[in-house]
Amino acid sequence: MRINVIATLALMFASPVAITAESSSYELTIKNHRFEPQQITVPADKKIKLMVTNQDSTPEEFESYELNREKIIPGGKKAVIYFGPLKPGKYPFFGEFHQETAKGVIIAE
């Protein structure tokens, strides 16, 4: 009986942690002052890990007012940006240093 109670309590407390720790990973590349891909579709209500690789020799800043995120990625370097869970919708982002070409959108479905 005592083992059953302990096992039940362990499962009750372990399950929410395992669920909230899950995240989906996506890759974004900066090349020729553009984001590739320009559109990323992600699941709604999940934490997102965005791995950004800057293949340009100059820095770029990933910025999104809707995601409340900004991150400078030096030329030739990588960065990881976490956000979410997101409600269904569109979340535009842009490159602060090259706004005319570095644009994209994350779509949560």
Predicted features and spans:
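N-terminal signal peptide c-region/cleavage motif recognized by signal peptidases
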Residues: 14-16
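Short beta-strand/loop motifs in extracellular/secreted proteins, especially
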Residues: 48, 58-60, 102-104
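Asparagine-centered strand-capping/turn motif at beta-strand->loop junctions
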Residues: 52-54
